[in-house]
Amino acid sequence: LVALFLWLGFWQLDRAAQKQQAAIEQKSRSGEGRLRLSGEALEAESARYREVVVAGQFVEGSQFLLDNRKHKRVAGYHVMAPMHIEGSERAVLVNRGWVAQGKSRAEVPFIALPTGLLQLEGVVRVPVSQGFRLEQQPAAAVRLYLDLQQISQMIGLELLPFVVRQQSEVENSGVGDGLIRAWKLESRDSDPAMHYG
């Protein structure tokens, strides 16, 4: 039993160190200047935490909600949509922001998807591998996890191997979308992993 608790303590300390490293990397990358996504192949690690600008069109009928996302302890979803990058045969998955869950799980919020040629700014995030999964996830309006390969097959375009967390309102859309984009910066000061370790 003691060995288990020791292992858990070291595991928590390792998680805290990983989060500290991510915070340092994120701060250093934010000073590198904005990268324009042109549809060229990009490695996930070379783009991680970079500020980007992307122009293109959201792929019609492909928006979905990523379940089990909280904002200020309120249950909700991240609104995800692939954007076909202008002048290319590639797309990038955009995390458009957070929306609260309805009064019940059966009430799925409707979020309009902007149409036409658009431009937005964001920060690159690399999705965490999900490891073991019980079954293939159906192509549905609400998903439990990201599967970039499945989304790529669904839309018929190659997806860049990362997600852009949208920071700005979409230019040229004419309306605000009401989504919350209060993305947390990785923080070493408030990391519970350090306290548990």
Where are the regions that the model predicts?
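Surface-exposed, charge/polar-rich loops and edge strands
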Residues: L1-E45, Y49-G197
